[in-house]
């Protein structure tokens, strides 16, 4: 069984301490999954990965894609309101090129579960279900206290062992709009797991939704509309490193970083099966990457 994880970001220090959060996240992903795809989208100067590379425990399973600003503008049809880190397009680039039997769409600030726990979810599933895993919060105060007053990226695994047994399930339901039976948990986009055939059938994330908000709920509704099951998982834990910002769509809509949001009714109320083209994820374009 091969498991791939897709992580996206932009080198803009969104939420603060982005490099530090990314280091914990990517190290844990490298450890848990067979393949980790990092897509750096629209970074103003250089990929975030270059800033943290020296603190990563690389072992040859990290694929690094860079979509520079000029390419990002072209791929969003020069829409001035497109999300600065355009999640749906960046995720689809990774999902379309992932080689795993199971694919996880996740975020840059997540400390990932242990391998055996992910395998347990998969082995107890029916191969026709999309899962969303509920996060638990971990703060910098907790991290620094555990490490003796500082950050210790090389002992991320010891930190994970500690917070595994010193945290509680976070059961927080969510409905974005009347009739939303698809979000099922708060922040459902932190960790979405499905067999590759489901991602292929629904053609990844809906590529019209190039603004912040609702794309994660949308992809879960699409899975149901295509005849698949949807389930929330509250244990095993995965951990969101709290950055203290309002968030709202992974791109700072609440803070005004992005000025326009996806329409909630287009994304949730009226979504049926996918409208993505067969070339979703820009499969008709060869995008270079490096393996680290």
Where are these regions (language model features)?
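C-terminal catalytic/acceptor-binding lobe
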Residues: 180-181, 186-188, 208-292
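Short beta-strand/loop segment that forms part of the nucleotide-sugar
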Residues: 33-44, 65-69
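Cell-envelope/extracellular polymer assembly enzymes that use nucleotide-activated donors
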Residues: 2-6, 35, 218
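Short beta-strand-to-loop acidic/aromatic patch adjacent to the donor-nucleotide binding site
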Residues: 100-113
